[in-house]
């Protein structure tokens, strides 16, 4: 029995299966409010140092300032990305990516697919990269980036990050002009739409982000998360993963303050630098930790390679 057709759920499963076949481990989304898939610890920590990584995962993302009370057909404060991170990147990674679009019935021979230069930067993560936006018929659907620096550290080797904008791709696949009309899933001709699931949340979260969040409460939360992160970083045996989570929570609070326009331009820059200082400290200590362990994933890759050579 065919239970689903051209829907949002199907889009996710196609990408998961495709990248699994390309050798990626499929991870689960980080269970914290973050602004992009890049903030997931699999990407942030995985791109530090020489150890290889092949990972893919869906990530729910929040950008409070982008909320439009559930009234804008393509602007959301909560949305989904599908993230792929590979280190070192294969030489034919762009073709591998284009093949994934083909599985989504997006054929470059039929549609106008362009790689438009757009170097990427994330100041709070101390990260930047050389990259492109991928446009489908004039609409951005993917960010394609070769990381040069993460946590203020030079990437050796570089990692490639591919970030699919799932809502935009789904709108193309389903020929919808309003994100809330997207079919999320269907079973026996019963359809659940994106709006059925998320439109009320967009209304309420937008009200909170722009009107009802307590600014003093947010300032206090930021300070407490910052202090907690510092404490965990500076332990004799630092809790780096936990500290990074506290930094992400502080970062979300910063985004809420930004949505409320509670920060002057100078204050905003100061908060960015405070977050960046913490992520840099985590990155440096994490690199040293992995180094002291002998970068074990490097050895694991060599062991797998040696076994494959013996079999062949």
From Swiss-Prot:
Name of the protein in its database record: Glycine--tRNA ligase alpha subunit
Compartments where found: Cytoplasm
Self-association and partners: Tetramer of two alpha and two beta subunits.
Membrane-crossing segments per the record: none
EC supergroup of this enzyme: ligase
Record keywords, A-Z: Aminoacyl-tRNA synthetase, ATP-binding, Cytoplasm, Ligase, Nucleotide-binding, Protein biosynthesis
Secretion signal span: none
EC number: 6.1.1.14
Family under the similarity heading: Belongs to the class-II aminoacyl-tRNA synthetase family.
GO cellular component, as recorded: cytosol
GO molecular-function term, one example from the UniProt record: ATP binding
PANTHER family tied to this protein: GLYCINE--TRNA LIGASE, CHLOROPLASTIC_MITOCHONDRIAL 2 (PTHR30075:SF2), GLYCYL-TRNA SYNTHETASE (PTHR30075)
The keyword Ligase appears for this protein: yes
Superkingdom as given in the UniProt entry: Bacteria
Organism whose genome encodes this protein: Buchnera aphidicola subsp. Acyrthosiphon pisum (strain APS)
GO biological process: glycyl-tRNA aminoacylation
InterPro entries referenced in this protein's UniProt entry, alphabetically: aa-tRNA-synth_II/BPL/LPL, Gly-tRNA-synth_heterodimer, Gly-tRNA_ligase_asu
Reactions listed under catalytic activity: tRNA(Gly) + glycine + ATP = glycyl-tRNA(Gly) + AMP + diphosphate
């Amino acid at each position: 029995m065919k239970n689903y057709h051209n829907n949002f759920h199907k889009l996710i499963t196609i990408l998961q299966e495709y990248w699994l076949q390309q050798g990626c481990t499929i991870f689960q989304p980080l269970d914290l409010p973050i602004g992009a898939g890049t903030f997931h610890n699999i990407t942030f920590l995985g791109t530090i140092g020489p150890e290889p990584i092949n990972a893919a995962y869906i990530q729910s993302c929040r950008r409070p300032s982008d909320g439009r009370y559930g009234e804008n057909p393509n602007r959301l404060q909560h949305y989904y990305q599908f993230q792929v991170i590979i280190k070192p990147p294969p030489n034919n990674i762009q073709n591998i990516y284009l093949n994934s679009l083909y599985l989504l019935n997006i054929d470059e021979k039929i549609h106008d697919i362009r790689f438009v230069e757009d170097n990427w930067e994330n100041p709070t993560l101390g990260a930047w990269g050389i990259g492109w936006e991928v446009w489908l018929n004039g609409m951005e659907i993917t960010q394609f980036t070769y990381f040069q620096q993460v946590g203020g550290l030079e990437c050796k080797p570089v990692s490639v990050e591919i970030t699919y904008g799932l809502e935009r791709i789904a709108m193309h696949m389903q020929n919808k002009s309003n994100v809330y009309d997207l079919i999320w899933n269907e079973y026996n001709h019963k359809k659940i739409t994106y709006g059925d699931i998320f439109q009320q949340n967009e209304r309420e979260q937008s009200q909170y982000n722009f009107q009802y969040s307590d600014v003093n409460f947010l300032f206090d939360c930021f300070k407490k998360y910052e202090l907690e992160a510092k404490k965990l970083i500076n332990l004799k045996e630092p809790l780096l993963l936990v500290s990074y989570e506290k930094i992400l929570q502080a970062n979300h609070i910063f985004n809420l303050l930004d949505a409320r326009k509670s920060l002057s331009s100078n204050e905003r820059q100061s908060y960015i630098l405070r977050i960046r200082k913490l992520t840099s400290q985590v990155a440096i200590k994490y690199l040293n930790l992995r180094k002291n362990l002998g970068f074990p994933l490097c050895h694991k890759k060599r062991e797998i390679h040696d076994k494959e050579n013996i079999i062949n």
